[in-house]
Regions:
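Conserved active-site and SAM-binding loop architecture
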Residues: 1-144
Length: 144
């Protein structure tokens, strides 16, 4: 039986890969741009490929994975942030993850990823009178 494989976008310090390993899932690649978190994940996951900036990735070219996890930037969704929501410069990066998921599914005839997991702040539920969360749900259900 093939082990489940994980790709992590907006990886931070590698919490999703850490949880994956504890569940017998193999972290294959990660996308992160901050140097300090990358140094942490390289130490904990020396075999995991680090891909850099999510905006420069093409899901059709990434090694296919069963699970894509991501915690896209929350600054514009947070209740203590500017509340620009998904239209904000940082939080709009959510759509980059959705793009990558769609591209990978296109390249694998819908086989990969089978699961996508998004993590974010509570403000994501209420941002823009809940319309941002409605957009999130719509993006996930429109990834065929």
């Amino acid at each position: 039986m093939t082990a489940l494989r994980l790709g992590s976008l907006f990886d931070g310090i590698g919490v999703f890969p850490l949880a994956a390993v504890r569940c017998g899932i193999e972290p294959v690649w990660a996308s992160e741009i901050e140097k300090a978190p990358i140094s942490i994940t390289k130490r904990h996951f020396p075999d995991m490929e680090h891909l850099g900036d999510v905006t420069k990735l093409d899901g059709r070219e990434l090694p296919p994975v069963h699970i894509i996890t991501f915690g896209s930037p929350c600054q514009n969704l947070s209740q203590i942030g500017n509340r620009k929501g998904l239209a904000g410069e940082k939080s709009s990066l959510f759509f980059q993850a959705i793009r990558i998921i769609r591209e990978m599914r296109e390249a694998t005839n819908g086989l990969f990823p089978a699961i996508a997991v998004w993590e974010n702040v509570m403000g994501a539920f209420s941002s823009n009178d809940r319309m941002d969360f409605k957009a999130v749900l719509g993006a996930f259900t429109d990834t065929d």
